[in-house]
């Protein structure tokens, strides 16, 4: 499947220019495809993260009629059994980073994990959607740092004194959940290229 995509344009489904910028930065110059951002209105699916990613990717591929890459991000609070999870976008819109921090006010456990799933489709509905997952563990803290990237101000990765928002982009992009997922996507393409996609 990867070999059939090499050299082709893949539509990365996002309306967020910052996200495209970060993805291109992480993938670097050696990624064998061209990513082009396109905002597509997809239904808000419910369910487990993998199910949501597959449904979104299939629908995006149907609309684009070609190869697509869809990203889904979850922020999961362990004290809340994994919530907000895939619904983080809506929680963030209503509560802002301060409100996310407040959600855990009554809990000792402030641990959380950020999960990023990239779903890739060739655009052919008979081919399976491939999933590439990355996860980073951390703590939910009082928001600190720049406010230009979602919930970054209240997520402090384990082993670091800074929140995602306080870190230089170059550092964040070597440890983030998005980096880990994209690293798996890169590996998939390089293994497929090396093996002639057999």
Curated annotation (Swiss-Prot):
The modification Phosphoserine is found at residue 146. One of its GO terms (molecular function) is nucleotide binding. It is found in: Cytoplasm. ITP binds at residues 14-19, 56, 72-73, 89, 149-152, 172, 177-178. Keywords: Acetylation, Cytoplasm, Hydrolase, Magnesium, Manganese, Metal-binding, Nucleotide metabolism, Nucleotide-binding, Phosphoprotein. The modification N-acetylalanine is found at residue 2. Mg(2+) binds at residue 44. This is Inosine triphosphate pyrophosphatase. Transmembrane segments: none annotated. Disruption phenotype: Pups die about 2 weeks after birth with growth retardation and heart failure. Accumulates ITP in erythrocytes. Accumulates inosine in RNA and deoxyinosine in DNA. Belongs to the HAM1 NTPase family. It catalyses: ITP + H2O = IMP + diphosphate + H(+); dITP + H2O = dIMP + diphosphate + H(+); XTP + H2O = XMP + diphosphate + H(+); N(6)-hydroxy-dATP + H2O = N(6)-hydroxy-dAMP + diphosphate + H(+). NCBIfam families: RdgB/HAM1 family non-canonical purine NTP pyrophosphatase. It comes from Mus musculus (Mouse). SUPFAM superfamilies: ITPase-like. GO terms for biological process: chromosome organization; deoxyribonucleoside triphosphate catabolic process; ITP catabolic process. Its cofactor is Mg(2+); Mn(2+). The lineage of its organism: Eukaryota, Metazoa, Chordata, Craniata, Vertebrata. Its EC number is 3.6.1.66. Pfam families: Ham1p_like. Homodimer. It comes from the Eukaryota. Binds 1 divalent metal cation per subunit; can use either Mg(2+) or Mn(2+). GO terms for cellular component: cytosol; nucleoplasm.
